[in-house]
Regions:
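His-Asp-centered catalytic microenvironments across diverse enzyme cores
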Residues: 13-14, 18-22, 31-33, 97-110, ...
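Secondary-structure boundary elements
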Residues: 1-67
């Protein structure tokens, strides 16, 4: 299924962006509100089976919205990571928070990182940002090389909040915000770095432990936030 795919991380990102529709954005693509939109976590192989059941053939094909599967940011990152690794490009999923959504200053988000041998660094890419996303969010940067500060790993967000650089209430998803949420994402990020991805819905019971946090103050880290 991957044999006819391009080798460019940018082209692979574009392909993934056309395979999935984020459930929270379905209405923007003209998907009827009564449409069943499964949100179960899927491995890359299962996602490919579903993709082929909707539109058999090359993954390069331009897909109408009704021929795409439904998912979340985690699913985009899994597919992009899978394709990059197939091309022997070192890649990994990261869990943290993005600053380019309008729902929360630091919105819960998953992306993919790949190693650039030319630049000798890990490059962060967001496969969710298709043309519709970029237009509605006013995004002008390259989604295959996220500028510094547009995405923070969970660990960076933890340091920023604990150091007083930003209110913990500005970090999370919807009404679920604060240190407990950041810590959940720290566990998720650690696990995906160990090749043990967890469900985006797995909180590990962390909110119940919120009262146990230490009040130790940390010095603010040097993190540049994109304006």
């Amino acid at each position: 299924m991957y044999d006819d795919l391009p080798k460019s991380p940018s082209e692979l990102r574009d392909i993934v962006s056309r395979l999935i529709i984020h459930v929270a954005w379905a209405a923007q693509y003209g998907i009827p509100p009564d449409t069943t939109m499964p949100r179960e976590t899927q491995a890359a192989g299962e996602r490919l089976k579903q993709t082929q059941s909707l539109l058999p053939g090359s993954l390069r094909a331009n897909r109408l919205p009704e021929k795409r599967s439904f998912g979340t940011c985690r699913d985009y990152s899994i597919m992009h990571c899978s394709m990059l690794r197939h091309q022997a490009i070192p890649a990994r999923i990261r869990c943290g928070f993005a600053t380019y959504f309008t729902t929360c200053p630091f919105e819960d988000h998953w992306i993919c990182e790949f190693w650039s041998s030319a630049d000798t660094r890990w490059v962060r890419a967001d496969a969710q940002l298709d043309e519709l996303h970029r237009k509605q969010l006013g995004i002008g940067f390259d989604p295959v090389d996220l500028p510094a500060g547009t995405f923070l790993t969970a660990g960076q967000a933890w340091q920023l909040a604990r150091g007083g650089g930003v209110s913990e209430d500005a970090i999370g998803h919807g009404a679920a915000r604060g240190l407990w949420f950041i810590r959940v994402n720290m566990y998720r990020d650690l696990l995906v770095l160990r090749n043990q991805p967890v469900s985006a819905w797995d909180t590990g019971g962390m909110r119940a432990r919120q009262a146990r946090f230490s009040t130790v103050k940390l010095s603010p880290p040097s993190i540049h936030l994109q304006k």
